[in-house]
């Protein structure tokens, strides 16, 4: 009997596969499948065995196997494109399952089902943790192609992705026979020094958390302070100054909707009060202040001093009531200015939400993956235009002028490097995240492009399962994307 080819030996299973036995994050994605690739060699030379790759599909593959629409997710995304790009998915929309067989595959290093630091290493009988090898953008493309071929795909009609997903899309373009058209959004031909520096700053936040322990931590006791700080830093690069000023300015949170988080003990002395203000927002603070010499601002002598009449929490932004009889006039005059604002509240909320759905080692793994991205690497020239001169497939490049992470100039460079590219602008003041928020514009640009270059696919109608009603709900909050009003958190 003839041995199976690598493609034929790939099997499909679900999230209960042994590779996920310690991975709590995989349960966040419903109805996804997991492909198991028996053997896969990474660019770094390491060989992985029984490699899980998570994916979701919508629609039906046609008999020619050429109506595949591939969606590539961003850094913290998952295979559940219905969560982060739901308003674009459905009949009559850009990602129409009545025309396309839509596939979204999870990247290596992500905590959502594909091989990563949180998946099981059969050789060590533990999760990979910090020993998970470096996986590149090209590794993602190579292993994803195996899954698509196993699904019966003969050609990708269109590959679409933003940010990190756009990097995968650009790499897919080099598979000229397999890929018919691409739509890279808010991405780059090579990861810039600016982006590399932001990734480094975020990783250093994680490294500096004492709980990180070189990456050897329990999945239920990860370095949340460091990971949360990294997420805050990243969020600032995903938005714009204009976006934050317009939404927050110097407003303070509504205490009835956003109670003051992690309220500190009521200060009993001026020193204690200063300590409260100074450590507000410090997730690793002590319960009570303790000086380096072992003394405490709340010592008995301090409590008996005249200044101990300062007995209420200094203003931290939310309105508070104070018993005027407990404070003398000079204390009231010295009452400090607000130190807790809506912008801070939003960042802390997002950090808290993120650390409940992501893993620190995975964050490090994926940001290092981004750093490897360079479309010219190993292709004989440092000139993108030179290495891409023979890539004649239709290309739609979408960019955002307010994007400070993947600048509009970089989108212009992408469009100029392809022989057959069109550049369109997404009008948004939201910065980089505009590609996950401006659904109407993104949908319109992609549909116009499809009608021009995929008319044969668009004229076909295939059967498909009814979509979850929540997929197209623009008012629901996304787990992996940006579908939320950032002033209604």
From Swiss-Prot:
Gene Ontology CC terms, in alphabetical order: cytosol
GO BP terms, alphabetized: 'de novo' L-methionine biosynthetic process; L-methionine biosynthetic process; methionine biosynthetic process
Protein's name according to its UniProt entry: Homoserine O-acetyltransferase
InterPro entries xrefs: AB_hydrolase_1, AB_hydrolase_fold, HAT_MetX-like
Stated role: Commits homoserine to the methionine biosynthesis pathway by catalyzing its O-acetylation.
Root EC class: transferase
Keywords: Acyltransferase, Amino-acid biosynthesis, Cytoplasm, Methionine biosynthesis, Transferase
Composition-biased stretches (Basic and acidic residues): 280-290
Effect of residue 432 to A: Loss of activity
Pathway per the UniProt entry: Amino-acid biosynthesis; L-methionine biosynthesis via de novo pathway; O-acetyl-L-homoserine from L-homoserine: step 1/1
Region (Disordered): 255-329
Gene3D superfamilies: alpha/beta hydrolase
Location(s) in or outside the cell: Cytoplasm
Protein source organism: Schizosaccharomyces pombe (strain 972 / ATCC 24843) (Fission yeast)
One GO MF term: homoserine O-acetyltransferase activity
Effect of residue 403 to N: Loss of activity
Keyword Chloroplast annotated: no
Stretches assigned to the AB hydrolase-1 domain: 69-438
Family: Belongs to the AB hydrolase superfamily. MetX family.
Annotated Low complexity bias: 299-329
Chief location of this protein within or outside the cell: cytoplasm
Catalytic reaction list: L-homoserine + acetyl-CoA = O-acetyl-L-homoserine + CoA
Entry annotation: catalytic residues: 163, 403, 432
PANTHER family: HOMOSERINE O-ACETYLTRANSFERASE
Listed EC numbers: 2.3.1.31
């Amino acid at each position: 009997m003839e041995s199976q080819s690598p493609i034929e030996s790939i099997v499909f299973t679900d999230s209960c596969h042994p590779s996920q036995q310690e991975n709590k994050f995989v349960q966040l994605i419903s109805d996804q499948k997991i492909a198991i690739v028996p053997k896969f060699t990474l660019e770094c030379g390491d060989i992985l065995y029984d490699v899980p790759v998570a994916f979701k599909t919508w629609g039906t593959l046609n008999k020619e196997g050429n109506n595949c629409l591939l969606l590539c997710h961003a850094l913290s995304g998952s295979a559940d494109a219905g969560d982060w790009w739901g308003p674009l998915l459905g009949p009559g929309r850009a990602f129409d399952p009545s025309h396309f067989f839509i596939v979204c595959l999870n990247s290596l290093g992500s905590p959502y089902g594909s091989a990563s630091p949180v998946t099981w290493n059969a050789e060590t009988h533990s999760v990979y943790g910090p020993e998970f090898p470096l996986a590149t953008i090209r590794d993602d493309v190579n292993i994803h192609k195996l899954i698509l071929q196993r699904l019966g795909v003969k050609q990708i009609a269109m590959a679409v992705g933003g940010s990190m997903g756009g990097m995968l899309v650009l790499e897919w373009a080099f598979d000229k026979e397999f890929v018919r058209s691409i739509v890279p959004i808010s991405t780059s031909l090579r990861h810039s020094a600016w982006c590399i520096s932001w990734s480094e700053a975020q990783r250093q936040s994680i490294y500096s958390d004492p709980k990180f322990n070189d990456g050897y931590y329990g999945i239920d006791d990860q370095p949340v302070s460091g990971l949360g700080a990294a997420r805050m830093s990243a969020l600032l690069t995903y938005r714009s100054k204009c976006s934050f000023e317009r939404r927050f300015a110097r407003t303070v949170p509504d205490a009835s909707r956003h109670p003051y988080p992690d309220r500190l003990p009521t200060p009993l002395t001026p020193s204690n009060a200063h300590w409260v203000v100074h450590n507000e927002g410090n997730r690793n603070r002590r319960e009570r202040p303790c000086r380096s010499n072992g003394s405490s601002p709340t010592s008995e002598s301090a409590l008996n001093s005249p200044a101990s009449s300062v007995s209420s929490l200094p203003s931290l932004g939310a309105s508070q009531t104070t018993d005027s009889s407990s404070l003398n006039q000079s204390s009231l005059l010295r009452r400090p200015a607000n130190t807790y604002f809506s912008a801070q509240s939003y960042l802390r909320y997002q950090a808290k939400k993120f650390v409940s759905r992501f893993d620190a080692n995975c964050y490090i793994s994926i940001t290092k993956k981004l750093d490897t991205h360079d479309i010219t690497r190993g292709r004989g020239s440092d000139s993108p235009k030179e290495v891409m001169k023979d890539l004649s497939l239709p290309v739609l490049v979408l960019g955002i002028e307010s994007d400070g992470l993947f600048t509009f100039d970089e989108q212009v460079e992408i469009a100029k490097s392809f022989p057959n590219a069109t550049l369109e602008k997404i009008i948004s003041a939201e910065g980089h995240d505009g590609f996950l928020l401006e659904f109407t514009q993104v949908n319109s640009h992609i549909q116009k492009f499809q009608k021009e270059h995929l008319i044969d696919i668009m004229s076909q109608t295939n059967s498909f399962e009814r979509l979850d009603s929540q997929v197209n709900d623009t008012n629901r909050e996304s787990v992996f994307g940006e579908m939320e009003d950032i002033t209604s958190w």
